[in-house]
């Protein structure tokens, strides 16, 4: 056998192998029945993942040898299983884009058991009065907030605390423990009560001091006395006013000798009206 015959034998063997590969693919019965596909059109098969490699194979193959044919993907049992489930998923309704269904406003959907009420702190003027009345779970009071609630002391408790504060402005630890047990309170309550009571007492004391100073400093000033009268001795040295008859008081000579007569009186006073002497008759 020469070389030409060997070439033709190898070419014929290669053609037979390619023809075997080009043969129809066997049909598989693993796919679903045809009745399930009635009225449903499956999507087209995806493109080949390696189109460049297939084109290179077509270009590099001999002219008398056709390229390898890829069997249809629909005959693959895995692809048929995918087609069986894909239409069912496409038939499901699409979920809404937002958290609320179409035609519904955001404020309409609410929990049926939740009562819609305004803010609790807007319903009462007291800071902590709403905590005991509010039953909503969303606005339930926290454990930390319960510590800040105001303690309501009874009259008996206030009486004992006031009596203790009257004797001691600052309470000691043993006495505080004793009062807490006796009044059914905590040490913290008694400590805070004494702190507040001391602040109130200090404010009252400051107010009293400020009021006394204002009253003492704001009094009406007494009128000043005459400059001529400065002591009680000068008042005694001054003579009484003269009688209407023009007689000189007896204290005038004494005052004249001492040189302390007032300017209105002279040293030798003369009566205002002196009777004329009668001439003596000759005997």
Curated annotation (Swiss-Prot):
Biological process per Gene Ontology, one example term: positive regulation of insulin secretion
Record keywords: Activator, Cytoplasm, DNA-binding, Homeobox, Nucleus, Phosphoprotein, Transcription, Transcription regulation
Key word Cytoplasm present: yes
Phosphothreonine sites (modified residues): 151
Bias (Pro residues): 41-50, 238-252
Recorded coiled-coil stretches: none
DNA-binding span(s): 146-205
PANTHER family in alphabetical order: PANCREAS_DUODENUM HOMEOBOX PROTEIN 1, PROTEIN ZERKNUELLT 1-RELATED
Protein known as: Pancreas/duodenum homeobox protein 1
Gene name linked to the record: PDX1
